[in-house]
Structure formats: C-alpha cells, structure tokens
C-alpha cells in the first residue's frame, strides 16, 4: 500500500511530457541515421542495431510511466482517492515498476546523453579515420546476437525479418566482391593469400568477441536496474571498444608496413607491386590513432586482446575511400605484414651478404688473375743459380720464405720497381723480371737480381733504384739492402759486432776487478784499525789511572829502586845531599808516606 500511495502522489502531467521528449529524441535519431549513412557502406539498420544497447533502456522505462499516467488519470478528480479499477490495474502490474519509477524518471535524461553525444559523432565525424572496407565485413556480425535478447522493441524499429533479409543481401554482395577480389589476388599475390586466409578467422573472432561483450553489458545493465547512471557508463565503456578499437590499428600497422617496404626495397625482393598503394598512410591518421589508443589504454583495462587488434584493419582504406577494390582488399590483407616482416630482414641481409661475397669473389678473381702475370716476372730460384752473379742482399724484418714473399709481397715489389725503372732508362714492361732466392732458412735474408733483355742489371743501377723506393721497401718488410761486394764488409761488420761485445765485456770485467780491489783494500784497512785503536786505548787508560789515582803502577818500582840506589850513596857519603841528586832525595823523602800508602793499597788489591 505504501508503494501505491507513493506512486499516486506523482503529478499526472510529468509522465506524458517525458514520453513526448523521449519519442522526439528517438525519432530525430532515426531520421539522422536514415539521412546520413556511413561513408563505408553503413545503413540505417546497422545504426539502429548499434543504438540498441543504449536506446532500449529508456524504452523499458516508458511502459511503466504510460501505465502510471493512465492509472493516475482514472482517479476521481475531487475525491483524491483512486477508483477501484485504478487499484486493480495497479495491483495486476508487476511490482518492480513501482519502486523503479522514480529513479527511471530522474535518470532517463542520463540515458539520452550518451546516445546523442557519443554515438553520432563517432559514426559521422570520425568515420573517415575509423571505418574500413574490412570493417564492413565486421559490422553485419555485430547485430547478429542482438535480436536474441529479450528486449522490448520500439514502435519505429523494423521487424526482424526485414533486417535479416537486408543483412543476408549485404552479406551475399560482400561475399561476391570478396570472391572476385580473392581471384584477382590469387593471380597476382600468390604468397600473400596463405597468411590472408589465416587473418580472416581472427577478424571474425574479434567481431564475435566484441559483439558478445556488448550484449553482456546490456544484460548486466538490466539485471542491475537500480543503478541506471552506472549502467549508462558501462554502456559507453562497452560500446567504446567496438567503435574505437579500429582506430588503434594504424599505429601498429603503418610502421610495420613502412619498414617492410623499405626492407623489401633494399633487398629488391618485392613480392607484389599492388601492395605499394596501401603503404602510403599519412601521419595524421597515425596521430589520431595514437590519441585513440592512449584513450583506450586508460579506459578499457578489461580487454586483454589489444595486441591482436592490428590484424583486423589497415589505415589505407580510411584515407583513400575511392581506391579500386584491389587496393582496399590489400589493405584488409595487411595483417600478414608481421609474418612477412620477419622474413624480409633475413632476405635483406642475405642480399647484402651475396653482394659482399660477389665483391670478395671479384677481388679474389682479380688477384688470381694477377698472380700468374706476377709469377712470370717474380721468380724464386735456387741459391746455386745466383752464385757468381751480381745479386743484392735484402735484409728482411722477419724470417720469411721466398715463395711466401713472392705470393704476398712480390706484386708490391714489382710495382715499386716498375715505378722506378722509367727514371733510370731501363727496359720496357715485360722485358725484365726479378729473381729471388733464400740462401739459408735460418737467416732473415733474401737474394735479389734484376734481369733485363741484356742480362743482369748492374748492382749500382739496382741500388740507385732501390734508394728511391727505400721507404716503400720498409712497408713490405725489407729493412735494408746490400751488394755482393759488401758481403765481406757484412762479415767484418759481424766481427765488429763481436768486437764491440768483447769490448763491453772487457769494460765490465775491469769494473768488476776494480770493485774487488777496492774490497780488498777496505778489508785491509779494517784490519789495521783495531791495532791502532788498542794502542791508543791502553795509553789513555794509563793516563786516566795516573790522573785519577796518582798511582803510577809501572813507575813505582823504578822510582823505589832509584830512591834505594840514591839513598845508599847518601848514607855512605854524607855530603851527597848537596850534590846533583839532592832533588831526588828530597822528593823521595817527601813521598815516603805516599809510598807506604801505595804498598798498602797494593796489598788490598
């Protein structure tokens, strides 16, 4: 009863006004959809099918409003209470419309917003950059699951039979066009068709998944009829991928196509000339595609199969709608680019390797062609053949065999000699040759003779020629050169080398002898020093003892003996005191007590 009273309080004029507004809006949408078809073959039926997820929801909210408006009009004007018939009609009505009525009436304007603001700009303004001939195959697949939903069709909607007939006709036309285009492509692009047929089921699977997402969103919206505003947002998010996902494809398709064209142009392995049309995609389409991709990456996290979307469309059909069907079909077959792109770099590298191999083979052929010509003028002979001739000794930087030098550095030596020969007025080209020989395997020497038409060229002329190219000879491993007359000088030079070595050894030996002599002198000096130190040390001790104790140890006996000898004559001759030894007697007389003390000290010791 509370619900009935709450429904009766609504003003009777509000529901008719809302009905008029909703009907007018959808009639305008129908007229706009029928007058302005899509640029890529979109019909009014396809537009209506796309509008079903958003347009059916307000229609569900219209029927309860109609019944409520009629029921409210049946009440008595003056009594303020509904009549019995009005109450019976309200009781028979499903109860869910009573408590949903206020929210549906308040939120019906929210449902009109996305349909008017979101759907039509995407289909009219951005159709040039979004739609493609390959999308024309997808669009009939989108409305196929929609008639299965238990939804209330609007009064202006076409019956399903007519729609099915039109869809079947369109599909038949498209199939015929596709078959014609495939026949033409099979003649021109035989390697392309294999991957193209693999791309078709992916396109259809994507169309089925996108179409299955939209009815799922509408079903969940009807189940959660309490939150109409949130369901409107879900409608936008569910319709977003189905309409805007093709805009993501230019960013992923165009760079790969351009790279593949550049790589195929470098390798000169272009499989078909018809593909050149679709690769001319302007930067504006790619910029719009990047913007659309950035928007989708933030809005739709629920779609996990975005990396597979580039296999559905290509931007060439959107930018060039007036192209022949072959160009549009090649744009639809552009998903095979990733498969072919993996093969083109290898082909390009193979092409470059082939070119490099050809160049190397050409150089090797030229070198091989020169070797026989050089071998006739640069010859290795035995040492016995050069004995007694005016040969020149070439001192090499390394121990190299004659044959190895002839093969690797003989042409360079020949070229250097050819440059110098005209200056010295020697024979013409081909009238002379160079003979080389190695006297011993251990020495880094080669013997060279220059033989002309008149015989062996004198060594002085050869030396003058080699003097002009001395720096160039160092580059090919010839350190210096000498003549046969300087062979003895070379031996003496070796001897002089030994002499210098001997001199160095003698000098080093002399230095060692000097060092040894100095060592012996130092040892002798060290032996003399202890003796000198011992003597001086004894004298110092005696002096110290005499100075400290006044005790002349060695002189005591001598003094006492002298005093004893002096006393005897003094006793015998009494006048001896005045004689020359009187001073000793006086000193002895004075030292008597000291002498007794000394003897006492000696006894103590």
UniProtKB/Swiss-Prot annotation:
Region Disordered: start-end pairs: 129-347, 554-605
Subcellular location: Membrane
Main location: membrane
Region (O-glycosylated at one site): 129-134
Sulfotyrosine found at: 97, 118
Family: Belongs to the podocalyxin family.
Name of the featured protein: Podocalyxin-like protein 2
Species annotation: Homo sapiens (Human)
